[in-house]
């Protein structure tokens, strides 16, 4: 036989041998059940339909992935390139564990926002956001004036909240944050404390040519040797309004012990005043936030640092509440101001935060809250209030999380989609001619499955996040400043005090 016939026979033998080995030793005939969802969670087509595209001066949600490399190389900061955003009437909630990339998104949002020249307020608790922007010349490049409020930095811009108060209602709201009722049992102490504190504020203002600060009020209160002498001073030398407040406090309770406890609660609230730097920074103002935020191209950074939060958490909440109140009162006199509150849960509880968020929709204050978990929000505000805060945020973004409660929460928000389940099994069957063969049985049926299963939320990769808006959900490529823009440098300094030290070192050199 010709040689090629041997080759053909050899190939045939090898094929039959492989089929025999595969069928008898390799092939897995165990039953299988696979699910094929009608839609993948990475499909952003539906989400894109409800997001705005090409608007300037709206909160960034994601970049347009269809922009060509040529256009990106010509415009790396995307100054003229369209992005996906949401209306300035919206509020957003961003959830993700530490290190998941939330700060990268904040920086990307700020860079995109600065294209519009509109002002913004950003909490910077690490701190690093102001430092990265300033070190890389971004604030100067976009022509922004910055105000850095850091109560524990001696070189920080000083700010006295009372300088921007316009009414009794403004003062009362701040006192609610400064002296909240922590429980039903402590409500009477808080009420009395607020009356005495308000009387003291008005007393100091009336005796200091209209000037008053937390520092001067604290100094006045501790200068009185006892609660009796404080009340006597207010009642004897105060204005009619001060006397009215003292009388109201005395009618509320005639117990000297109760008064002493209430005043002690006021003094305890001012424990942060034992820090001389904080006392100095709260005593006067370098800027009026009310006037500054009416202007374009102003960036305010609230640097209430994480390692000092045990001391300054009440001050942090006080400034957040104060800024929201200011922006509500001057809304008709300004453009949109973007509020970015990172690690809001590190501060003290802000009373009626959910109601406030529902109100600000029409006040030109797009607001994004950044937190580490839904569980933390519930722990801080309670289940009912936490649910209201989440509901007040029309857009939710969730990075990888570590707790199953948050993962299940966002999975449920995404809803379910139809899926085809294909079941496959193999069973031995005898043919008509008596041969034993394996018969494959396939069945198909439809069922509902989670669009984004909880386990996916626990395993999201870096740079990925779930976005939920107007009933649509998708896993998106979340904007990252260091990857998507030329802003790749770190921070050479993080506080105004660091900047002064660098300048002094350079001058010596």
Where are each of the predicted segments found?
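Conserved ATP-driven motor cores of ASCE-family P-loop NTPases powering translocation/secretion/packaging/pilus
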Residues: 357-359, 363-466
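Feature marks short, highly hydrophobic, charge-poor N-terminal signal-anchor/signal peptide-like helices
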Residues: 1-10
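P-loop NTPase motor domains
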Residues: 18, 22-40, 71-78, 83-365, ...
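Polar low-complexity intrinsically disordered regions enriched in Ser/Thr and small residues
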Residues: 57-60, 196, 418, 437, ...
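Membrane-embedded transmembrane-helix bundle of lipid-linked glycan/lipid transferases
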Residues: 9-15, 99
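N-terminal pre-Walker A segment at the start of P-loop NTPase domains
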Residues: 48-81
């Amino acid at each position: 036989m010709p040689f090629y016939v041997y080759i053909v026979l050899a190939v045939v033998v090898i094929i039959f041998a492989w089929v025999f080995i595969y069928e008898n030793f390799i092939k897995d005939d165990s039953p299988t059940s696979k699910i094929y969802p009608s839609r993948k969670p990475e499909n952003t087509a539906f989400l894109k339909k409800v997001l705005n595209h090409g608007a300037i001066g709206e909160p960034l949600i994601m970049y347009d992935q269809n922009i060509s490399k040529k256009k990106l190389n010509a415009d790396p900061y995307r100054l003229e390139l369209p992005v996906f955003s949401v209306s300035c009437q919206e509020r957003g909630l961003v959830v993700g564990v530490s290190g998941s990339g939330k700060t990268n998104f904040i920086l990307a949002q700020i860079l995109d926002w600065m294209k519009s020249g509109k002002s913004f307020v950003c909490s910077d608790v690490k701190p690093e956001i102001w430092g990265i922007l300033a070190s890389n010349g971004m604030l100067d490049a976009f022509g922004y004036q910055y105000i850095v409020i850091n109560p524990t930095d001696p070189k920080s811009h000083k700010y006295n909240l009372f300088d921007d108060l316009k009414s009794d209602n403004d003062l009362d709201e701040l006192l609610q944050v400064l002296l909240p009722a922590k429980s039903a049992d402590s409500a009477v102490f808080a009420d009395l404390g607020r009356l005495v504190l308000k009387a003291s504020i008005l007393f100091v203002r009336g005796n200091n040519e209209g000037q008053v600060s937390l520092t001067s009020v604290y100094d006045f209160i501790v200068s009185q040797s006892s609660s009796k002498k404080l009340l006597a001073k207010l009642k004897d030398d105060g204005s009619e309004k001060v006397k009215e407040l003292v009388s109201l406090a005395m009618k509320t309770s005639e117990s000297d012990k109760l008064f002493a406890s209430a005043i002690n609660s006021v003094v305890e609230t001012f424990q942060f005043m034992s820090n001389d730097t904080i006392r100095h920074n709260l005593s006067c103002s370098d800027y009026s936030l009310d006037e500054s935020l009416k202007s374009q191209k102003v960036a305010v950074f609230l640097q209430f640092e994480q390692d000092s939060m045990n001391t300054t958490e009440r001050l942090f909440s006080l400034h957040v509440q104060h800024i929201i109140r200011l922006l509500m009162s001057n809304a008709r006199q300004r453009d949109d101001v973007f509020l970015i509150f990172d690690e809001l849960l590190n501060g003290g509880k802000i009373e009626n935060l959910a109601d406030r968020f529902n109100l600000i929709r029409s006040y030109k204050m797009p607001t994004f809250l950044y937190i580490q978990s839904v569980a933390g929000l519930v722990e801080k505000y309670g289940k009912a209030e936490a649910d209201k805060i989440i509901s007040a945020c029309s857009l939710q973004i969730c990075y990888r999380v570590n707790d199953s409660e948050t993962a299940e929460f966002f999975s449920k928000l995404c809803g379910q989609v139809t899926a085809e389940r294909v079941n496959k099994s193999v069973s031995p069957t005898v043919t008509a001619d008596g041969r034993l063969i394996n018969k494959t049985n396939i069945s198909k049926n439809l069922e509902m499955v989670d669009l984004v299963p909880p386990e996916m939320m626990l395993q999201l990769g870096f740079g990925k996040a779930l976005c939920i808006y107007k009933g649509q959900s998708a896993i998106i490529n979340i904007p990252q400043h260091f990857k998507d823009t030329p802003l790749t440098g770190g921070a050479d300094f993080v506080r105004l005090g660091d900047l002064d030290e660098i300048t002094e070192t350079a001058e010596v050199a």
